Protein backbone atom coordinates (compact mmCIF):
# COMPACT_ATOMS: atom_id res chain seq x y z
CA UNK A 1 0.00 0.00 0.00
CA UNK A 2 1.33 3.45 -0.91
CA UNK A 3 1.82 6.06 1.81
CA UNK A 4 -0.88 8.12 0.16
CA UNK A 5 -3.36 5.23 0.36
CA UNK A 6 -2.29 4.41 3.91
CA UNK A 7 -3.15 7.90 5.13
CA UNK A 8 -6.12 8.57 2.85
CA UNK A 9 -8.49 8.34 5.83
CA UNK A 10 -7.07 11.68 7.01
CA UNK A 11 -8.74 13.34 4.02
CA UNK A 12 -12.09 11.57 4.47
CA UNK A 13 -15.01 13.87 5.36
CA UNK A 14 -16.31 11.09 7.64
CA UNK A 15 -13.14 11.28 9.77
CA UNK A 16 -13.48 15.04 10.20
CA UNK A 17 -17.18 14.72 10.98
CA UNK A 18 -16.58 12.04 13.63
CA UNK A 19 -13.86 14.12 15.31
CA UNK A 20 -16.17 17.14 15.27
CA UNK A 21 -18.93 15.15 16.99
CA UNK A 22 -16.48 13.82 19.59
CA UNK A 23 -15.13 17.33 20.28
CA UNK A 24 -18.61 18.87 20.61
CA UNK A 25 -19.81 16.04 22.87
CA UNK A 26 -16.67 16.35 25.02
CA UNK A 27 -17.24 20.10 25.32
CA UNK A 28 -20.83 19.57 26.50
CA UNK A 29 -19.83 16.98 29.13
CA UNK A 30 -16.85 19.08 30.26
CA UNK A 31 -18.91 22.26 30.60
CA UNK A 32 -21.66 20.50 32.56
CA UNK A 33 -19.50 18.31 34.81
CA UNK A 34 -16.78 20.88 35.54
CA UNK A 35 -18.08 24.31 34.41
CA UNK A 36 -15.50 26.32 36.35
CA UNK A 37 -12.61 24.27 34.98
CA UNK A 38 -13.96 24.59 31.43
CA UNK A 39 -14.31 28.37 31.72
CA UNK A 40 -10.86 28.91 33.22
CA UNK A 41 -9.17 26.60 30.71
CA UNK A 42 -10.50 28.54 27.74
CA UNK A 43 -10.96 32.11 28.97
CA UNK A 44 -8.20 32.77 31.49
CA UNK A 45 -5.21 34.65 30.09
CA UNK A 46 -2.35 32.38 29.02
CA UNK A 47 -0.01 35.34 29.14
CA UNK A 48 -0.31 39.11 29.46
CA UNK A 49 1.77 42.20 28.79
CA UNK A 50 2.01 45.00 31.36
CA UNK A 51 3.62 48.42 31.25
CA UNK A 52 5.67 49.03 34.39
CA UNK A 53 3.39 49.07 37.44
CA UNK A 54 0.30 49.88 35.39
CA UNK A 55 -2.54 47.54 34.63
CA UNK A 56 -2.34 44.85 31.99
CA UNK A 57 -2.36 46.38 28.51
CA UNK A 58 -2.73 43.14 26.58
CA UNK A 59 -3.66 39.56 27.39
CA UNK A 60 -4.67 36.55 25.35
CA UNK A 61 -6.59 33.40 26.23
CA UNK A 62 -6.73 29.98 24.59
CA UNK A 63 -10.22 30.86 23.32
CA UNK A 64 -8.83 33.95 21.56
CA UNK A 65 -5.94 32.00 20.04
CA UNK A 66 -8.38 29.49 18.56
CA UNK A 67 -11.02 31.98 17.40
CA UNK A 68 -8.74 34.69 16.04
CA UNK A 69 -5.57 32.90 14.93
CA UNK A 70 -6.35 29.25 14.22
CA UNK A 71 -9.72 30.11 12.68
CA UNK A 72 -7.90 32.51 10.35
CA UNK A 73 -5.96 29.47 9.10
CA UNK A 74 -9.26 27.61 8.73
CA UNK A 75 -10.68 30.51 6.69
CA UNK A 76 -7.47 30.51 4.62
CA UNK A 77 -8.26 26.87 3.81
CA UNK A 78 -11.87 27.85 2.99
CA UNK A 79 -10.52 30.56 0.68
CA UNK A 80 -8.32 28.02 -1.12
CA UNK A 81 -11.40 25.81 -1.60
CA UNK A 82 -13.39 28.76 -2.94
CA UNK A 83 -10.73 29.71 -5.48
CA UNK A 84 -10.23 26.11 -6.59
CA UNK A 85 -13.97 25.55 -7.02
CA UNK A 86 -14.29 28.74 -9.08
CA UNK A 87 -11.44 27.58 -11.34
CA UNK A 88 -12.70 24.00 -11.59
CA UNK A 89 -14.59 22.82 -14.67
CA UNK A 90 -17.72 22.23 -12.58
CA UNK A 91 -17.96 25.96 -11.75
CA UNK A 92 -15.79 27.52 -14.45
CA UNK A 93 -18.72 28.91 -16.44
CA UNK A 94 -21.68 30.99 -15.29
CA UNK A 95 -24.14 28.35 -16.50
CA UNK A 96 -22.49 25.61 -14.43
CA UNK A 97 -22.10 27.80 -11.36
CA UNK A 98 -25.57 29.36 -11.51
CA UNK A 99 -27.60 26.60 -9.82
CA UNK A 100 -25.46 25.95 -6.70
CA UNK A 101 -24.60 29.62 -6.18
CA UNK A 102 -28.18 30.84 -6.66
CA UNK A 103 -29.40 28.02 -4.40
CA UNK A 104 -26.85 29.15 -1.80
CA UNK A 105 -28.33 32.64 -2.01
CA UNK A 106 -31.75 31.19 -1.20
CA UNK A 107 -30.19 29.27 1.69
CA UNK A 108 -28.90 32.56 3.07
CA UNK A 109 -31.77 34.97 2.42
CA UNK A 110 -34.64 32.86 3.78
CA UNK A 111 -32.99 31.74 7.06
CA UNK A 112 -31.85 35.31 7.77
CA UNK A 113 -35.38 36.58 7.02
CA UNK A 114 -36.96 33.99 9.32
CA UNK A 115 -34.61 34.96 12.14
CA UNK A 116 -35.41 38.63 11.57
CA UNK A 117 -39.14 37.83 11.72
CA UNK A 118 -38.79 36.36 15.22
CA UNK A 119 -36.39 39.01 16.54
CA UNK A 120 -37.37 42.27 14.79
CA UNK A 121 -37.39 45.25 17.12
CA UNK A 122 -35.37 43.51 19.86
CA UNK A 123 -31.74 43.68 20.95
CA UNK A 124 -31.21 40.16 19.58
CA UNK A 125 -31.89 41.06 15.94
CA UNK A 126 -28.13 41.24 15.30
CA UNK A 127 -28.02 37.45 15.25
CA UNK A 128 -29.64 37.24 11.80
CA UNK A 129 -26.37 35.99 10.30
CA UNK A 130 -26.24 32.87 12.49
CA UNK A 131 -28.72 30.62 10.59
CA UNK A 132 -27.31 31.51 7.17
CA UNK A 133 -24.15 29.43 7.67
CA UNK A 134 -23.33 25.86 6.60
CA UNK A 135 -20.75 23.54 8.15
CA UNK A 136 -19.23 21.93 5.07
CA UNK A 137 -17.29 19.34 7.11
CA UNK A 138 -20.45 18.05 8.79
CA UNK A 139 -22.55 18.22 5.63
CA UNK A 140 -20.06 16.33 3.46
CA UNK A 141 -19.45 13.86 6.29
CA UNK A 142 -23.14 12.93 6.46
CA UNK A 143 -23.35 12.80 2.65
CA UNK A 144 -20.37 10.41 2.63
CA UNK A 145 -22.24 8.18 5.10
CA UNK A 146 -25.07 7.87 2.55
CA UNK A 147 -22.49 6.37 0.20
CA UNK A 148 -23.21 5.34 -3.38
CA UNK A 149 -26.97 5.83 -3.01
CA UNK A 150 -26.48 9.41 -4.18
CA UNK A 151 -24.67 10.46 -7.38
CA UNK A 152 -21.22 12.06 -7.34
CA UNK A 153 -22.75 15.14 -8.95
CA UNK A 154 -24.71 15.75 -5.72
CA UNK A 155 -21.48 15.96 -3.73
CA UNK A 156 -20.15 18.46 -6.27
CA UNK A 157 -23.40 20.43 -5.97
CA UNK A 158 -23.21 20.47 -2.15
CA UNK A 159 -19.53 21.49 -2.21
CA UNK A 160 -20.25 24.35 -4.62
CA UNK A 161 -23.31 25.40 -2.62
CA UNK A 162 -21.28 25.43 0.61
CA UNK A 163 -18.54 27.50 -1.05
CA UNK A 164 -21.15 30.06 -2.14
CA UNK A 165 -22.61 29.96 1.36
CA UNK A 166 -19.17 30.50 2.93
CA UNK A 167 -18.42 33.37 0.57
CA UNK A 168 -21.60 35.17 1.62
CA UNK A 169 -20.90 34.40 5.28
CA UNK A 170 -17.43 35.94 4.95
CA UNK A 171 -18.90 39.08 3.38
CA UNK A 172 -21.50 39.33 6.15
CA UNK A 173 -18.80 38.99 8.84
CA UNK A 174 -16.65 41.63 7.14
CA UNK A 175 -19.47 44.13 6.57
CA UNK A 176 -22.02 43.64 9.35
CA UNK A 177 -20.03 42.22 12.27
CA UNK A 178 -17.23 44.75 12.26
CA UNK A 179 -17.94 47.36 14.95
CA UNK A 180 -15.12 49.85 14.34
CA UNK A 181 -12.59 50.11 11.53
CA UNK A 182 -9.16 51.70 11.88
CA UNK A 183 -8.42 52.80 8.33
CA UNK A 184 -4.62 53.11 8.53
CA UNK A 185 -4.17 49.54 9.78
CA UNK A 186 -6.62 48.27 7.16
CA UNK A 187 -4.69 50.06 4.40
CA UNK A 188 -1.48 48.34 5.54
CA UNK A 189 -3.31 45.01 5.28
CA UNK A 190 -4.51 45.84 1.77
CA UNK A 191 -0.95 46.86 0.83
CA UNK A 192 0.20 43.40 1.89
CA UNK A 193 -2.50 41.82 -0.28
CA UNK A 194 -1.40 43.94 -3.25
CA UNK A 195 2.21 42.78 -2.77
CA UNK A 196 1.03 39.15 -2.75
CA UNK A 197 -1.14 39.69 -5.84
CA UNK A 198 1.83 41.22 -7.69
CA UNK A 199 4.06 38.34 -6.58
CA UNK A 200 1.47 35.91 -7.97
CA UNK A 201 1.36 37.80 -11.27
CA UNK A 202 5.16 37.72 -11.50
CA UNK A 203 5.18 33.95 -11.06
CA UNK A 204 6.57 33.81 -7.51
CA UNK A 205 5.78 30.36 -6.08
CA UNK A 206 7.84 30.41 -2.87
CA UNK A 207 5.39 29.55 -0.09
CA UNK A 208 7.51 31.45 2.46
CA UNK A 209 6.68 34.72 0.66
CA UNK A 210 2.93 34.15 0.91
CA UNK A 211 2.95 32.78 4.45
CA UNK A 212 5.25 35.44 5.91
CA UNK A 213 3.55 38.45 4.30
CA UNK A 214 0.12 36.91 4.88
CA UNK A 215 0.80 36.34 8.59
CA UNK A 216 3.08 39.22 9.53
CA UNK A 217 1.49 42.00 7.49
CA UNK A 218 -2.03 41.06 6.40
CA UNK A 219 -3.28 39.06 9.40
CA UNK A 220 -1.84 41.40 12.06
CA UNK A 221 -3.04 44.49 10.17
CA UNK A 222 -6.58 43.13 9.80
CA UNK A 223 -6.59 42.15 13.48
CA UNK A 224 -5.54 45.67 14.48
CA UNK A 225 -7.97 47.32 12.03
CA UNK A 226 -11.12 45.97 13.68
CA UNK A 227 -12.03 43.77 10.70
CA UNK A 228 -12.12 40.19 11.96
CA UNK A 229 -8.76 38.55 11.29
CA UNK A 230 -10.40 35.50 9.67
CA UNK A 231 -11.21 37.71 6.66
CA UNK A 232 -7.46 38.06 6.14
CA UNK A 233 -7.25 34.29 5.74
CA UNK A 234 -9.74 34.26 2.87
CA UNK A 235 -8.17 37.31 1.21
CA UNK A 236 -4.65 35.84 1.31
CA UNK A 237 -5.94 32.55 -0.11
CA UNK A 238 -7.12 34.32 -3.26
CA UNK A 239 -3.57 35.58 -3.90
CA UNK A 240 -2.09 32.05 -3.91
CA UNK A 241 -0.86 31.03 -7.41
CA UNK A 242 -3.09 28.57 -9.25
CA UNK A 243 -1.07 28.11 -12.46
CA UNK A 244 1.30 25.25 -13.23
CA UNK A 245 4.79 26.14 -14.48
CA UNK A 246 4.82 23.39 -17.11
CA UNK A 247 2.05 21.52 -18.89
CA UNK A 248 1.32 17.87 -18.17
CA UNK A 249 2.43 16.99 -21.71
CA UNK A 250 5.86 18.57 -21.26
CA UNK A 251 6.12 17.00 -17.82
CA UNK A 252 5.53 13.51 -19.20
CA UNK A 253 8.07 13.96 -22.01
CA UNK A 254 10.80 15.23 -19.66
CA UNK A 255 9.99 12.74 -16.89
CA UNK A 256 10.14 9.80 -19.30
CA UNK A 257 13.61 10.92 -20.39
CA UNK A 258 14.79 11.11 -16.79
CA UNK A 259 13.24 7.74 -15.95
CA UNK A 260 14.89 6.10 -18.95
CA UNK A 261 18.20 7.48 -17.70
CA UNK A 262 17.58 5.63 -14.44
CA UNK A 263 17.12 2.32 -16.25
CA UNK A 264 20.76 1.40 -15.67
CA UNK A 265 20.06 1.57 -11.92
CA UNK A 266 17.51 -1.24 -12.27
CA UNK A 267 19.92 -3.90 -10.97
CA UNK A 268 21.55 -1.74 -8.31
CA UNK A 269 20.44 -3.40 -5.06
CA UNK A 270 22.61 -1.25 -2.81
CA UNK A 271 20.94 1.31 -0.57
CA UNK A 272 23.53 3.93 -1.58
CA UNK A 273 22.51 5.56 -4.88
CA UNK A 274 24.85 6.80 -7.57
CA UNK A 275 25.29 10.52 -8.16
CA UNK A 276 23.44 10.12 -11.46
CA UNK A 277 20.46 8.50 -9.73
CA UNK A 278 20.34 11.17 -7.03
CA UNK A 279 20.48 13.93 -9.65
CA UNK A 280 17.72 12.33 -11.75
CA UNK A 281 15.44 11.78 -8.75
CA UNK A 282 15.97 15.38 -7.64
CA UNK A 283 15.09 16.62 -11.13
CA UNK A 284 11.94 14.46 -11.18
CA UNK A 285 10.95 15.86 -7.78
CA UNK A 286 11.44 19.46 -8.92
CA UNK A 287 9.70 18.72 -12.20
CA UNK A 288 6.72 17.21 -10.36
CA UNK A 289 6.43 20.36 -8.25
CA UNK A 290 6.51 22.55 -11.38
CA UNK A 291 3.73 20.45 -12.93
CA UNK A 292 1.59 20.75 -9.79
CA UNK A 293 -0.92 23.46 -8.93
CA UNK A 294 0.44 25.42 -5.89
CA UNK A 295 -3.08 26.21 -4.72
CA UNK A 296 -4.10 22.54 -4.69
CA UNK A 297 -0.87 21.53 -2.95
CA UNK A 298 -1.52 23.99 -0.13
CA UNK A 299 -5.17 22.96 0.11
CA UNK A 300 -4.24 19.29 0.36
CA UNK A 301 -1.60 20.00 3.00
CA UNK A 302 -3.97 22.12 5.10
CA UNK A 303 -6.99 19.81 4.88
CA UNK A 304 -5.99 17.40 7.70
CA UNK A 305 -4.75 20.30 9.86
CA UNK A 306 -8.04 22.12 9.39
CA UNK A 307 -10.44 19.18 9.61
CA UNK A 308 -8.66 17.11 12.26
CA UNK A 309 -7.20 19.80 14.51
CA UNK A 310 -8.49 23.35 14.09
CA UNK A 311 -12.23 22.68 13.65
CA UNK A 312 -12.47 20.06 16.45
CA UNK A 313 -10.47 22.38 18.75
CA UNK A 314 -12.86 25.22 17.89
CA UNK A 315 -15.82 22.96 18.73
CA UNK A 316 -14.19 21.96 22.01
CA UNK A 317 -13.75 25.59 23.01
CA UNK A 318 -17.08 26.93 21.77
CA UNK A 319 -19.70 24.17 22.08
CA UNK A 320 -19.48 23.86 25.85
CA UNK A 321 -22.79 25.17 27.20
CA UNK A 322 -24.42 24.29 30.51
CA UNK A 323 -27.68 22.44 29.91
CA UNK A 324 -30.11 22.51 32.84
CA UNK A 325 -33.80 22.96 33.59
CA UNK A 326 -33.61 26.67 32.79
CA UNK A 327 -32.76 25.77 29.20
CA UNK A 328 -36.23 24.29 28.68
CA UNK A 329 -37.73 27.71 29.28
CA UNK A 330 -35.39 29.16 26.65
CA UNK A 331 -36.85 26.97 23.90
CA UNK A 332 -39.41 29.72 23.22
CA UNK A 333 -36.73 32.42 23.25
CA UNK A 334 -36.81 34.43 19.97
CA UNK A 335 -33.12 33.63 19.47
CA UNK A 336 -33.81 29.88 19.62
CA UNK A 337 -36.90 30.14 17.43
CA UNK A 338 -35.11 32.27 14.84
CA UNK A 339 -32.00 30.07 14.63
CA UNK A 340 -33.85 26.74 14.75
CA UNK A 341 -36.52 27.73 12.23
CA UNK A 342 -33.90 29.38 10.03
CA UNK A 343 -31.65 26.32 9.87
CA UNK A 344 -34.27 23.54 9.93
CA UNK A 345 -36.91 25.17 7.70
CA UNK A 346 -35.33 28.19 6.05
CA UNK A 347 -32.21 26.45 4.72
CA UNK A 348 -33.83 23.56 2.81
CA UNK A 349 -36.81 25.65 1.71
CA UNK A 350 -34.65 28.54 0.49
CA UNK A 351 -32.30 26.23 -1.41
CA UNK A 352 -35.20 24.32 -2.98
CA UNK A 353 -37.22 27.41 -3.98
CA UNK A 354 -34.27 29.27 -5.52
CA UNK A 355 -33.12 26.14 -7.38
CA UNK A 356 -36.66 25.55 -8.65
CA UNK A 357 -36.98 29.17 -9.77
CA UNK A 358 -33.73 29.02 -11.72
CA UNK A 359 -34.74 25.83 -13.53
CA UNK A 360 -38.20 27.24 -14.36
CA UNK A 361 -36.50 30.31 -15.86
CA UNK A 362 -34.28 27.95 -17.93
CA UNK A 363 -31.20 29.59 -16.43
CA UNK A 364 -29.94 26.37 -14.88
CA UNK A 365 -30.62 22.66 -14.66
CA UNK A 366 -30.20 19.88 -12.14
CA UNK A 367 -26.89 17.99 -12.33
CA UNK A 368 -26.95 14.57 -13.98
CA UNK A 369 -28.60 11.95 -11.75
CA UNK A 370 -29.81 14.51 -9.19
CA UNK A 371 -33.53 14.67 -8.33
CA UNK A 372 -35.54 17.23 -6.40
CA UNK A 373 -35.57 14.83 -3.45
CA UNK A 374 -31.78 15.01 -3.48
CA UNK A 375 -31.93 18.81 -3.47
CA UNK A 376 -34.29 18.84 -0.48
CA UNK A 377 -32.12 16.34 1.42
CA UNK A 378 -29.02 18.37 0.63
CA UNK A 379 -30.86 21.48 1.81
CA UNK A 380 -31.33 19.89 5.22
CA UNK A 381 -27.64 18.95 5.35
CA UNK A 382 -26.85 22.60 4.62
CA UNK A 383 -28.90 23.38 7.73
CA UNK A 384 -26.09 21.92 9.82
CA UNK A 385 -24.65 25.33 10.62
CA UNK A 386 -22.52 24.19 13.55
CA UNK A 387 -18.94 25.56 13.20
CA UNK A 388 -19.76 28.65 11.13
CA UNK A 389 -22.98 29.36 13.06
CA UNK A 390 -21.17 29.08 16.41
CA UNK A 391 -18.47 31.37 15.07
CA UNK A 392 -20.96 34.03 13.94
CA UNK A 393 -22.95 33.78 17.21
CA UNK A 394 -19.77 34.71 19.07
CA UNK A 395 -19.52 37.85 16.93
CA UNK A 396 -23.23 38.72 16.93
CA UNK A 397 -23.83 38.89 20.68
CA UNK A 398 -21.95 40.55 23.51
CA UNK A 399 -24.09 39.21 26.38
CA UNK A 400 -22.94 35.77 27.64
CA UNK A 401 -26.54 34.64 28.16
CA UNK A 402 -27.43 35.38 24.55
CA UNK A 403 -24.34 33.52 23.32
CA UNK A 404 -25.28 30.44 25.37
CA UNK A 405 -28.87 30.41 24.10
CA UNK A 406 -27.64 30.82 20.51
CA UNK A 407 -25.17 27.95 20.89
CA UNK A 408 -27.87 25.63 22.25
CA UNK A 409 -30.12 26.53 19.30
CA UNK A 410 -27.30 25.90 16.81
CA UNK A 411 -26.50 22.50 18.34
CA UNK A 412 -30.15 21.35 18.38
CA UNK A 413 -30.88 22.64 14.87
CA UNK A 414 -27.71 21.10 13.42
CA UNK A 415 -28.51 17.69 14.90
CA UNK A 416 -32.13 17.75 13.67
CA UNK A 417 -31.16 18.99 10.20
CA UNK A 418 -28.46 16.35 9.85
CA UNK A 419 -30.76 13.49 10.86
CA UNK A 420 -33.61 14.62 8.58
CA UNK A 421 -31.24 15.17 5.65
CA UNK A 422 -29.64 11.75 6.12
CA UNK A 423 -33.03 9.98 6.27
CA UNK A 424 -34.25 11.74 3.12
CA UNK A 425 -31.12 10.84 1.15
CA UNK A 426 -30.63 7.29 2.42
CA UNK A 427 -34.24 6.44 1.51
CA UNK A 428 -34.07 8.05 -1.94
CA UNK A 429 -34.36 5.67 -4.91
CA UNK A 430 -31.03 4.95 -6.58
CA UNK A 431 -30.90 6.21 -10.17
CA UNK A 432 -28.73 4.06 -12.41
CA UNK A 433 -27.30 5.15 -15.74
CA UNK A 434 -30.18 3.54 -17.63
CA UNK A 435 -32.47 5.91 -15.66
CA UNK A 436 -34.28 3.02 -13.98
CA UNK A 437 -35.14 3.53 -10.33
CA UNK A 438 -33.98 1.02 -7.76
CA UNK A 439 -35.06 1.13 -4.14
From Swiss-Prot:
Membrane topology classification: Multi-pass membrane protein
Question: Which spans are transmembrane here?
Answer: 14-34, 60-80, 98-118, 127-147, 156-176, 179-199, 213-233, 303-323, 335-355, 375-395, 408-428
Where found in the cell?
Answer: Cell inner membrane
Q: Which domain of life is it from?
A: Bacteria
Which UniProt key words apply to this protein?
Antiport, Cell inner membrane, Cell membrane, Ion transport, Membrane, Sodium, Sodium transport, Transmembrane, Transmembrane helix, Transport
Q: Which reaction does it catalyse?
A: Na(+)(in) + 2 H(+)(out) = Na(+)(out) + 2 H(+)(in)
Give the similarity note. Belongs to the NhaA Na(+)/H(+) (TC 2.A.33) antiporter family.
Q: What's the protein called, per UniProt? A: Na(+)/H(+) antiporter NhaA 1
Organism (species)? Psychromonas ingrahamii (strain DSM 17664 / CCUG 51855 / 37)
User: Taxonomic lineage of this organism?
Assistant: Bacteria, Pseudomonadati, Pseudomonadota, Gammaproteobacteria, Alteromonadales
